[in-house]
Amino acid sequence: PLAYMIFRASEAYLNYMEADYMKNKNLDDYSKKYWRALRKRAGVSENFQKTIDATDLSKENDLAVWSGSQMIDKTLYNIRRERRCEFIAEGMRKDDLLRWRSLDKMKNYQTEGFNWQEYQKEPYYVKQLAAGLVVSNSKYLRPHFANELIITNNGYNFEEANYLTPISYD
């Protein structure tokens, strides 16, 4: 592990924008400047307000729409979406979802895979079933239901966000 943390300018911009909006429920001139700079570098329209205005939260299938059991507003959601796009495939998404308490919507949630009744006759899956590697309590495969913690907790469960938790260096 590194002995020091590395922050890119884009990460600092997004952290500032989110904190500014969370604190003031408004974007100051710095936040607007940073947001336009991020979008310009990405090659998309710098007019972030147009994106905010076009957002319909009821049509968004994204956990980041939620903080705990409360739906957030369109501006904060678009800051979160910008963050998701900026850090795609960098392993920051889970930390963000935990920090925002967005995973609360998955408490006691059972993930289901493909339609088990359709595919259970395939030779590969018959072997998996015989080996005890498949758990299915519905017509859909439930691959994680073999995990003892998920069975005990009746699905996924997450701790509530703790904003005083230090940033890990590993």
Residue map of PLM features:
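Acidic/polar-rich alpha-helix caps and helix-coil junctions
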Residues: 1-170
